[in-house]
């Protein structure tokens, strides 16, 4: 475990608290979409392509390749 002064000085304490919140959210009961499924909405400023579709995984192309998003997975930030 890291010393508390290091966590405060480097801002890592905030990151650790956020990670704990994500872990607790992932452990929460599954939504109405069913186990292993999630509600998916995809829209542009002018058009809705999917609205509340029940899906198991969303594959997303990025500038560096592609990745899959699963229900209750850790949050990520990527340029699309």
UniProtKB/Swiss-Prot annotation:
Subcellular localization is given as:
Mitochondrion; Mitochondrion inner membrane
- Write the record's keywords in alphabetical order, separated by commas: ATP synthesis, CF(1), Hydrogen ion transport, Ion transport, Membrane, Mitochondrion, Mitochondrion inner membrane, Transit peptide, Transport
Q: Specify the transit peptide boundaries.
A: 1-22
One GO location term (cellular component): proton-transporting ATP synthase complex
**InterPro entries xrefs:** ATP_synth_F1_dsu/esu (IPR001469), ATP_synth_F1_dsu/esu_N (IPR020546), ATPsynth_dsu/esu_N (IPR036771)
Q: Answer yes or no on keyword Mitochondrion.
A: yes
* GO BP field: aerobic respiration; mitochondrial proton-transporting ATP synthase complex assembly
Q: Which GO terms describe its molecular function?
A: proton-transporting ATP synthase activity, rotational mechanism; structural molecule activity
Going by the entry's taxonomy, the superkingdom of the source organism is recorded as: Eukaryota
Identify the SUPFAM superfamilies for this entry: Epsilon subunit of F1F0-ATP synthase N-terminal domain
**Is Protein biosynthesis set as a keyword in this record?**
no
Tell me, what does this protein do in biology? Answer: Subunit delta, of the mitochondrial membrane ATP synthase complex (F(1)F(0) ATP synthase or Complex V) that produces ATP from ADP in the presence of a proton gradient across the membrane which is generated by electron transport complexes of the respiratory chain. ATP synthase complex consist of a soluble F(1) head domain - the catalytic core - and a membrane F(1) domain - the membrane proton channel. These two domains are linked by a central stalk rotating inside the F(1) region and a stationary peripheral stalk.
Oligomer and partners = Component of the ATP synthase complex composed at least of ATP5F1A/subunit alpha, ATP5F1B/subunit beta, ATP5MC1/subunit c (homooctomer), MT-ATP6/subunit a, MT-ATP8/subunit 8, ATP5ME/subunit e, ATP5MF/subunit f, ATP5MG/subunit g, ATP5MK/subunit k, ATP5MJ/subunit j, ATP5F1C/subunit gamma, ATP5F1D/subunit delta, ATP5F1E/subunit epsilon, ATP5PF/subunit F6, ATP5PB/subunit b, ATP5PD/subunit d, ATP5PO/subunit OSCP.
Question: What's this protein's family per the entry?
Answer: Belongs to the ATPase epsilon chain family.
* Name of the protein described by the UniProt record: ATP synthase F(1) complex subunit delta, mitochondrial
* Upper taxonomic lineage: Eukaryota, Metazoa, Chordata, Craniata, Vertebrata
Gene name, per UniProt, is: ATP5F1D
């Amino acid at each position: 475990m890291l010393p508390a002064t290091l966590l405060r000085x480097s801002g890592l304490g905030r990151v650790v608290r956020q990670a704990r919140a994500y872990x607790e959210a992932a452990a929460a009961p599954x939504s109405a979409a069913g186990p292993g499924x999630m509600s998916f909405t995809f829209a542009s400023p002018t058009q809705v392509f999917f609205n509340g579709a029940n899906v198991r995984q969303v594959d997303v192309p990025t500038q560096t390749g592609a990745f899959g998003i699963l229900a209750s997975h850790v949050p990520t930030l990527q340029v699309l």
